[in-house]
């Protein structure tokens, strides 16, 4: 995935499309999988809720 796919421009402002890792801080995005979000740097994982 390229960096330009992680951001978009709205009203002349840069908006991040992905969530940040709460452990690593800003700049480290969580990867989105089918059933979870995970950080490739520290291994932090959040599971998605089934509705």
From Swiss-Prot:
One of its GO terms (molecular function) is structural constituent of ribosome. This is Small ribosomal subunit protein eS31. Part of the 30S ribosomal subunit. InterPro entries: Ribosomal_eS31, Ribosomal_eS31_arc, Ribosomal_zn-bd. Belongs to the eukaryotic ribosomal protein eS31 family. The lineage of its organism: Archaea, Methanobacteriati, Thermoplasmatota, Thermoplasmata, Thermoplasmatales. Binds 1 zinc ion per subunit. One of its GO terms (cellular component) is ribonucleoprotein complex. NCBIfam families: PRK00432.1 (NF001669). A zinc finger (C4-type) spans 21-42. Its cofactor is Zn(2+). One of its GO terms (biological process) is translation. Keywords: Metal-binding, Ribonucleoprotein, Ribosomal protein, Zinc, Zinc-finger. Gene3D superfamilies: 6.20.50.180. Zn(2+) binds at residues 21, 24, 39, 42. It comes from Picrophilus torridus (strain ATCC 700027 / DSM 9790 / JCM 10055 / NBRC 100828 / KAW 2/3).
